[in-house]
Amino acid sequence: MRLAETVTFGGSGLNRAVELRGDAVQMAALLERGQVLPVWRGKPLVVAGVALGWVAPGHPVLAHGRAPVFLGLDGDVPRFAQDISDWAPEAGAEAVEHGFFDPSEQRHPALPGDHGFLELRGIMTQLTPRGAELAAMARAILHWHRSHGFCATCGAASEMAVAGWQRSCPACGAQHFPRTDPVVIMLTVDVARDLVLLGRG
């Protein structure tokens, strides 16, 4: 049995800059000089199938997007993600809505021809570890916002807060947070006899 040499999403060193998230003035300044990853219905923008497609905050592809979410500092570069799922691609380029994997690619008219929205499962191994981490984080947090638009306490519409890492209810004051706890999957192996222990619980 060969042990993995690298662990996906493990130890990339991305500075999440949690202390800056609640400062709206600082976030505005970071966004102005930052880069944004557009995400369409869970698919990140990708260049030539091998790299994430970062754009400037004022790019036309973001015109109909929701509020950006701060992902963190990648060195000195502030990274954000923005949900543009309300954009409708031209006829014939729709996503495959059923099944485990969507092989379709959507191209926005405001982007170069080698830029497209692709299913993360299909490109994960082509991305750098940092790119894979940022894409997975963007997909997860934006999906959380789309599926948690209403307060679980009173049912009123909630609002994005703290640079995208909280939803606040203006009606009852409740605060809601995404799940960010780590998950570990283990496999018990008997190397000498080439066996694994299966169980459920």
Ranges and model annotations:
Residues M160-Q166:
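Short linker/helix segments within small regulatory modules
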Residues M137:
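Phosphate-interacting basic helix/loop segments used at nucleotide- and nucleic-acid interfaces
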Residues R167-G201:
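N-terminal strand-loop-strand
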Residues H145-H148, G155, Q166:
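Residues immediately within or flanking Cys/His clusters that coordinate Zn2+
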Residues A156-E159, F177:
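Short functional micro-motifs and their immediate structural scaffolds
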Residues A51-W54, A132, R167-A171:
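Short Pro/Gly-enriched beta-strand edge/turn motifs at strand-loop
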Residues M1-L127:
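N-terminal alpha-helical interaction blocks
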